[in-house]
Amino acid sequence: MSMMYFNIFMAFTVSLVGLLMYRSHLMSSLLCLEGMMLSLFVMMSVTILNNHFTLASMAPIILLVFAACEAALGLSLLVMVSNTYGTDYVQNLNLLQC
């Protein structure tokens, strides 16, 4: 495994550990999810470029679109929770059940 792949994998791992450790605030969880998606995007782009696999050249863009949709939904949920309860704690999300 080259050093570049190792660094990208470590970025994903650090974001995953951050997501598992700092779960109290919704904003920190969203930032860790965005870090994971960004590292997946970079890993996918580098792999496709190194292997000259032109058939999958659209896959990183699709992943980026899904990451943008996830960020928009997460931020709208953050605004709704903070307006309703005054805080952005993840434990308030259990109160949103129907």
From Swiss-Prot:
<dbReference type="GO" id="GO:0008137">
    <property type="term" value="F:NADH dehydrogenase (ubiquinone) activity"/>
</dbReference>
<keyword id="KW-0830">Ubiquinone</keyword>
<feature type="transmembrane region" description="Helical">
    <location>
        <begin position="61"/>
        <end position="81"/>
    </location>
</feature>
<dbReference type="InterPro" id="IPR001133">
    <property type="entry name" value="NADH_UbQ_OxRdtase_chain4L/K"/>
</dbReference>
<keyword id="KW-0812">Transmembrane</keyword>
<dbReference type="Pfam" id="PF00420">
    <property type="entry name" value="Oxidored_q2"/>
</dbReference>
<dbReference type="GO" id="GO:0042773">
    <property type="term" value="P:ATP synthesis coupled electron transport"/>
</dbReference>
<feature type="transmembrane region" description="Helical">
    <location>
        <begin position="29"/>
        <end position="49"/>
    </location>
</feature>
<comment type="function">
    <text>Core subunit of the mitochondrial membrane respiratory chain NADH dehydrogenase (Complex I) which catalyzes electron transfer from NADH through the respiratory chain, using ubiquinone as an electron acceptor. Part of the enzyme membrane arm which is embedded in the lipid bilayer and involved in proton translocation.</text>
</comment>
<keyword id="KW-1133">Transmembrane helix</keyword>
<keyword id="KW-0520">NAD</keyword>
<keyword id="KW-0472">Membrane</keyword>
<dbReference type="InterPro" id="IPR039428">
    <property type="entry name" value="NUOK/Mnh_C1-like"/>
</dbReference>
<keyword id="KW-0249">Electron transport</keyword>
<feature type="transmembrane region" description="Helical">
    <location>
        <begin position="1"/>
        <end position="21"/>
    </location>
</feature>
<dbReference type="GO" id="GO:0005743">
    <property type="term" value="C:mitochondrial inner membrane"/>
</dbReference>
<comment type="subunit">
    <text>Core subunit of respiratory chain NADH dehydrogenase (Complex I) which is composed of 45 different subunits.</text>
</comment>
<keyword id="KW-1278">Translocase</keyword>
<dbReference type="GO" id="GO:0045271">
    <property type="term" value="C:respiratory chain complex I"/>
</dbReference>
<keyword id="KW-0496">Mitochondrion</keyword>
<comment type="similarity">
    <text>Belongs to the complex I subunit 4L family.</text>
</comment>
<keyword id="KW-0813">Transport</keyword>
<protein>
    <recommendedName>
        <fullName>NADH-ubiquinone oxidoreductase chain 4L</fullName>
        <ecNumber>7.1.1.2</ecNumber>
    </recommendedName>
</protein>
<keyword id="KW-0999">Mitochondrion inner membrane</keyword>
<keyword id="KW-0679">Respiratory chain</keyword>
